[in-house]
Amino acid sequence: VKLNDCNLFRQQAYINGRWCDADNGRSVDVHDPANGEHLGHVPLMGGAEAVRAIEAANAALEGWRAKTAKERAQILRRWFELLLEHEQDLAQLMTFEQGKPLHEALGEIRYAASFIEWFAEEGKRIYGDVIPSPAADKRLLVIKQGIGVCAAITPWNFPAAMITRKAAPALAAGCTMVIKPANETPFSALALVELAERAGVPPGVINVVTGDAPTIGAQLTGHPLVRKLSFTGSTPVGRLLMGQCAETIKKVSLELGGNAPFIVFEDADIEAAVEGALVAKYRNAGQTCVCVNRFYVHDAVYERFTARFVERVRELDVGHGSAEGTQIGPLITDKAVAKVQSLIDDATAKGADLLLGGKPHALGGNFFEPTVLGGIRPGMDLLQDEIFGPVAALVRFSSDDEVIELANDTLYGLAAYFYSRDIARVFKVAERLEYGMVGVNTGLISNEVAPFGGIKQSGLGREGSKYGIEDYLEIKYLCLAV
């Protein structure tokens, strides 16, 4: 990886303002998912290092909390500016460790930076309340204060944005943080904290611990000094972490799995729906929590939509993320490839029609062909399992009530999409879909000013928006005798 600023490539963890190795001297290798090439390594840390990071965050808490909201905002603003100044290097680093096309990586860096900019300002607007007192000799006030030491466990699919979406509101609220990034993509996290240090974030305010996830996670969920955990990842792991946090009654934010439906009604703009479907399905090779898992297409437009969709998917360029023109990169690991293949095999064995793709790409490695399946019916695993790959599954429907019932028939409730030009239908369908986010006539829904999160088993809490900082605050009631 060729960077303009070589100091952004860090192969050590960051605890209390110092770059450090694991106590045992061991490390975890990091590879390019496109070709398996060795990129570098990071420390294989465990419980002892996690405890030191937690203690460092706790020691830094008083000083950071004592700064005014404006002072914290100035530091965060500088962090935001540094991300944009180094966006090309950060994008290159991400493409090589995560695999996504360079233009998508660059988009993620700007997206990640937007959360820092947003929450730098939101920290100045943590307002309280004055309550009219029922007693003449009392004055009742409500203030909000940062919750304290926070922990974040972040995924590999958005290795920069999932960190800033948690760290920015935490720091803006006066909290400190310990971050455990995914072992597949640690370099993005370490580059971010290198820039945070340059921006003036004091030692201990933000820490990154790499290594053994279960051991580190057990400390982040079990240590009494940690008052809040934020996790983005799978529902099974989120369920486990939530249970571990129960022992010390931690506040928990969870952004978990999805099973997003994409509905094309008979009055939809078909060309617009096809373009929206491409983005909502194949971005990041289908490896996002809000990627479409199930396409429901009305009988009246099924053939037309399917023909055009297959035509457009066939045009997608698969390759290394750094290559010009690449639209789809590799899956993250060989296990991901095997999972996608097993879901396709299950569907075709049960009668699905293979319209395009269906197997690992000729490029080898972790590349997989963009795939379209038709004739999907109940009982096929991919209707309930999160695919997390470049596979589109198409289902016919004939009425609004039928498709809403089908769309809601899942444990998940993160994102949903639909295309229609009937304004009455738009409101009715949007309100009836059991999802935390609904995209209407668009396949892109996320930004820093909107609340991101799901319902049911897709999670708890919201990230981004004016609501995102609330998860890092405690409400305190003051009763004054006068």
Regions picked out by a protein language model, each given a short descriptive name:
Residues N35-H41, V226, I263, D317, ...:
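Conserved C-terminal structural/oligomerization subdomain of aldehyde/semialdehyde dehydrogenase
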Residues L39-M45, A60-A66, A152, F262-F265, ...:
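Short, well-ordered beta-strand elements within core beta-sheets of diverse protein domains
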Residues L61, R65, F80-E87, A91, ...:
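Structural signal for hydrophobic packing residues in well-ordered secondary-structure cores
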Residues G36, R72, M94, I116, ...:
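Residue-level signal for inorganic ion chemistry
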Residues K228, P236-R377, V440:
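ALDH superfamily catalytic-core signature
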Residues E37-I126, D137:
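Glycine-rich loop-to-alpha-helix module at the N-terminal edge of alpha/beta enzyme cores
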